Design a protein with these regions (language model features):
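Terminal alpha-helical segments
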Residues: 1-149
Length: 149
């Protein structure tokens, strides 16, 4: 039937998605570090948001060949958690600092670029970057498991 793919075709498509989105997410992370080190915290927050969004996109596309048209990283995280529950461990919401930091990251997609009132601290960025490092590792693990098997 049209639209039915063999397992090998699915694997090839998943690998292409992984190669594209994982590299893109990693590139945004490098740009985040550059901007943070220059003291451009709002721009760094936007770049970090893009890195997160793209790691989630990498997982969704590599594992399901589907990506909703959304920049809402909380929604994307929930979709990834349906693929692997370990995604719920990334960006925990167990205390006020974690919740505030994640909200700042979520808002960065719009506010970091367009609002003169957007603020994020180095401490918040450092915490979030640590979570993105975990996200990167989990993304690679989950996607490679899908591609390899």
């Amino acid at each position: 039937m049209p639209g039915d793919l063999t397992e090998e075709e699915r694997r090839i498509i998943a690998q292409k998605h992984f190669d594209h989105w994982f590299e893109s997410a990693s590139d945004f992370y490098i740009t985040y570090e550059f901007d943070k080190n220059r003291g451009k915290l709002s721009k760094a927050a936007f770049e970090l948001h893009q890195s997160v969004e793209r790691f989630f996109a990498c997982t969704l596309l590599s594992c399901t060949n589907y990506l909703p048209k959304s920049h809402n990283i909380e929604k994307l995280r929930k979709l990834c958690a349906q693929i692997d529950p370990e995604f719920t461990d990334i960006f925990p919401m167990e205390n006020k600092f974690h919740r505030r930091s994640f909200r700042c990251l979520q808002r960065a997609y719009i506010d970091a670029r367009y609002s003169e009132h957007y603020e994020i601290t180095v401490e918040e960025l450092d915490y979030l970057a640590g979570e993105v490092e975990k996200l990167k590792g989990l993304t690679e693990q989950v996607c490679q498991r899908r591609i390899g098997g």
